[in-house]
Amino acid sequence: PIATPDFFGANPEEARYAADLASVISNNFANSTPFKVVKKSAYLQTPAQLNQQGPVFPDWRGINADALLTGSVALTGDGQLKVEYRLYDTQSEQQLVGRRYTVDTRFWRHIAHRISDDIYQELTGEPGYFATRIVHIGETKGIEKGKGTMKKLCVMDQDSANYQCLTDGSSLVLSPRFNPNLQKIIYMSYANGLPRLYFLDMPTGQQTIIGDFEGLNSTPRFNAKGTKVAMTLTQGHEGNPEIYEMDMGSRTLKRLTYHRGIDTSPSYSPEGDKIVFNSDRGGQPALYTMNTDGSNVTRLTYGDGRYYAPAWSPRGDLIAFVKELRGVFHIGVIDPQGGEERLLTDSYMDDSPTWAPNGRVLVFSRQKSRSDISRLYTIDLTGYNLRELPTPTNATDPAWSPLIK
């Protein structure tokens, strides 16, 4: 258990930032499996007392807090926010980590997430995932601008804050993914009436077509370095979907699969030497792996049901997927070498799993019934801690960003 009292602020404005920072940090931990947040009503020291005299550790041990986070906030004359924090082990009465950040006041939420990541790393030994964003398709049903259903490219923080749409809905968009440096989003769009792959430049909002390939262009995925993109194309083979790879430097295209079955939804291993994909070449949709030159195609899943939408964990240890079994959709995980699969969810329609950058949490879309809208959810690898990420519209096709420094 961890205690997260409000940070200290010497005046009302600083105290407001101090309370807001602590609230974001506390919510991050409350929504993360390794942590249990001690209720603030049990705290025996105020932020001012903590700032003036430091922690009275027996008081914190008495409310079963193993870890204690304290901090302070100060505003500078040029609109900067100075944030200082300390994390203590209440049993040893020792400071575990402490740090000072200075940032423009506009970015106070980001600092709250950075502090959360610092503490997550210190207490679990693994990287955090709080200073991240989630891109997805925001879907508006009904009449807007004289149109029916509209699909927009939208992004938000991992806790649903700072929500914004990047496209106006005039063109259908699908399958968005961040590139590793967070400067671009790759996605499929019908901007000119044809399904083509585009980049959206995050700083400028400019959209650029990647390549005008004949037929269907879909499911683009970057490798971990951002130097290659795997995609599904139907060009030149009678409309049959195959996996291709594009070198982003030279823009050269290489075909990887050669089969009359439907091959789609590629996802790179973290090392970039293998790809997992979906194919019905065995009679029904299953998952396969191959080397990135197209060799050594190996079937991964043999269970009952149909498998879709594979996503290789950034840790390399698991592959997430969608499984449809007897009319029920599941999010599951499996070892890249095969073996026993684990199903984490079940619903009318669970779809599009992607990983947090630490490889320990998944985000996916869920439609609970035929008449329900689609929403975004996260779940950890235990299959517990399922939580909804609120969005103002229907939301599908999510993808997690890398950690934002």
Located regions from the model:
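Short loop/turn segments that connect beta-strands within beta-propeller blades
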Residues: 91, 157-161, 201-205, 247-251, ...
